[in-house]
Amino acid sequence: MHKAPESVLNALVPMVVEQTAKGERSYDIYSRLLKERVIFLVGQVEEHMANLIVAQLLFLESESPDKDIYLYINSPGGSVTAGMAIYDTMQFIKPNVSTVCIGQAASMGAFLLAGGAEGKRHCLPNSRVMIHQPLGGFQGQASDIAIHAQEILGIKNKLNTMLAEHTGQPLEVIERDTDRDNFMSATEAAEYGLVDSVIAKRS
């Protein structure tokens, strides 16, 4: 499938013009929403995206350490290490990070959704959530393959333990339910404990 060049995609980002005492000021829509403490995590979770998310989290903490941050997630998942960089920063900073699933939160996206502040994790009504075990592939000598297999198993156990803590589900239930791709509706995700509520309108 033909992929639009990045320059074209950037040109499609809406601009917002604000009137200030010093005149007009224009922002791209994401920068304007960042002023409202809204961060978007959209697409594949990878290192560059993770660095941008982490930087925004740290910036908003420095601006107002006592005000909530809102992380909107629409992601099919991606790199575990990149995702953990975001997750650890969410737990590290002082502000509560409220997570909201729009569209989908799958794999590492679902993990980050569940990692939001307790009582402040939400799904929109028609969003989808999917959990599963980490994926990995490696080629090389048999001894190196064995090392990587052990690493993946270790990551799997760690993620399952953390997911059990965030959802309140027993570890053995998490292990069973992540053995294969496990898709949930917004309501099912709330019942499972991945989020705290399904929201259709702002209160």
From Swiss-Prot:
GO terms for molecular function: ATP-dependent peptidase activity; ATPase binding; serine-type endopeptidase activity. It catalyses: Hydrolysis of proteins to small peptides in the presence of ATP and magnesium. alpha-casein is the usual test substrate. In the absence of ATP, only oligopeptides shorter than five residues are hydrolyzed (such as succinyl-Leu-Tyr-|-NHMec, and Leu-Tyr-Leu-|-Tyr-Trp, in which cleavage of the -Tyr-|-Leu- and -Tyr-|-Trp bonds also occurs). Its EC number is 3.4.21.92. The keyword Hydrolase applies. NCBIfam families: clpP (TIGR00493), PRK00277.1 (NF001368), PRK12553.1 (NF009205). HAMAP family: ClpP. Cleaves peptides in various proteins in a process that requires ATP hydrolysis. Has a chymotrypsin-like activity. Plays a major role in the degradation of misfolded proteins. This is ATP-dependent Clp protease proteolytic subunit. It comes from Shewanella halifaxensis (strain HAW-EB4). The gene is clpP.
